[in-house]
């Protein structure tokens, strides 16, 4: 009887801990933590309540194509994105576009649910040290484990993006106030035709800097018009984290 009770207690504790970690992980991905941090003091995040920000598998990183490993067996990304009316929120660090539909991505045999996308200016990931004006992160979560997958899209100045017009024109007037958009969007409009990518294991690029995030960076950039870029940077012109040491990590390249 005693053994049964101890086993039951252990099972309950395991369930509680797993549920707590899953909840915290999903919350950190759903919305940026808006307390006690800013981009001007990004190097101090680990000393101001976010110790994981000094971890050894942090994001973003610089990509050097010559040092990546081309793996013949890397699978294609399978996007299952559908039309939906998004929910928009200015979370005091960026404009965030929350899911309000059924959108998934399958990668390496796992299917992840789309949670939200948001903007960084300039790009956080660099290519041989070079930045682009904007980087978009599409954040996804494994519904079973809570594991996170982030698809990064570099954005150059060029042709306007119709989807982003709908989003930028619906920017909420009040910060931290989520509004439902009446516009219909499809996330495939944020993706190029060529979906070759770089991938590595990193972290969220904002506090709490949760590690173990799978990053997939689409090689071919998309474009926004100069006016669209300015519309974002007039409000947030420095919401990027500096590149972090790669340490012993490998960046893989699909072809």
Outline where the language-model segments fall.
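Alpha-carbonic anhydrase
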Residues: 4-6, 10, 25-255
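Residue-level signal for mature regions of secreted extracellular proteins and peptides
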Residues: 18-19, 46
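Sec-dependent N-terminal signal peptides
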Residues: 8-18
